[in-house]
Design a protein with these regions (language model features):
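Beta1/beta-strand and adjacent pyrophosphate-binding region of the FAD-binding site
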Residues: 1, 24
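Alpha-helical packing segments of well-folded alpha/beta enzyme cores
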Residues: 55, 59-63, 145, 149, ...
């Protein structure tokens, strides 16, 4: 939502048009109070869908346009994987090359270990047979970057109203065009509406009386009827509190963001007991 407002304001400004009073952002609570403020903050291009990869290549250019203002750290990203993921990661690398996205792909257990030990001489992960090292990307400090986005939008004349909850929409008669946005603080007339609600998009889908069930055609062209439009999976994430200094590279620098997936057995460093023999990641 904030990035859309920022870009729309840029378009109007470049065209010599007034922004104030024309772009309004409504936020139910406050800036960064939702998923954007608590998600992992990783900026990467490690996606299987080509469309997503092109989108992220574009987005990283935006991050790079103002690292300080957006609290962005361009340290790069690494996908360190076991053999079960080798083919898929190789395809991602191939498609990254096709859009001139800078990355390095290391294959083979010995070559992967050698590559990682250039960064960390005490590297000891087991079962690794490939490393995809994206030279672009890195991470951003979530809340700070969201406030940076808000600042960019407001400086161009965008009005951000917090503490306002959208309750529904009023449509033009005999039309699907939205005439007003109904909030718990009154109605706002508008010409266009952008819904940037993240995981809460289902609520707005229902407000717009859009279908709860859809038909989906799979890759083999089989049609699956009456599939739920929205399905939510519960994801549990954990944070490990460690001294940042112990994760520096051999030359004392901040390392890339590193994601390791392996099927090597995971043992407790407390009592040596087996935690899992299934694939796990960190």
């Amino acid at each position: 939502g904030l990035s859309s407002a920022w870009r729309l304001a840029e378009v109007l400004t470049e065209a010599g048009e007034q922004v104030e009073g024309r772009i309004v952002v409504l936020d139910k609570a406050g800036i960064a109070s939702g998923a954007s403020g608590i998600a992992c903050g990783v900026v990467r291009n490690n996606y299987f869908q080509p469309a997503m990869r092109n989108l992220m290549a574009h987005s990283i250019k935006v991050w790079e346009s103002d690292p300080k203002g957006l609290s962005y750290h361009p340290v790069g990203y690494m996908q360190v994987s076991c053999e079960a993921m080798h083919e898929d990661v190789a395809q991602i690398y191939s498609e990254q090359k096709s859009i001139q996205y800078e990355s390095v792909f290391i294959e083979g257990a010995a070559a992967s270990s050698k590559y990682m030990k250039v960064l960390f001489d005490d590297w000891q992960a087991q079962g690794i047979t490939s490393v995809l090292h994206e030279k672009l990307g890195g991470y951003a400090n979530n809340t700070t970057s969201m406030y940076g986005l808000a600042k960019k939008a407001e400086e161009l004349g965008v009005r951000i109203i917090t503490g306002v909850e959208v309750k529904g929409f009023t449509f033009e008669s005999s039309s699907k065009a939205i005439r007003t946005v109904e909030t718990d603080n009154g109605s706002i007339s508008c010409k266009h509406v952008i819904i940037g609600a993240g995981p809460w998009v289902r609520n707005f889908w229902d407000m717009l009386a859009l279908p709860k069930k859809i038909d989906v055609k799979d890759l083999d062209h089989n049609l699956h009827k009456d599939v739920d439009m929205w399905r939510f999976w519960q994801l549990e994430e954990g944070l490990l509190q460690v001294d940042p200094e112990i994760l520096k590279t051999n030359d004392g620098k901040v390392p890339p963001v590193i994601h390791v997936d392996t099927d090597a057995p995971l043992y407790s460093d407390v009592d040596g007991s087996l935690i899992t023999e299934e694939m796990w990641g960190i």
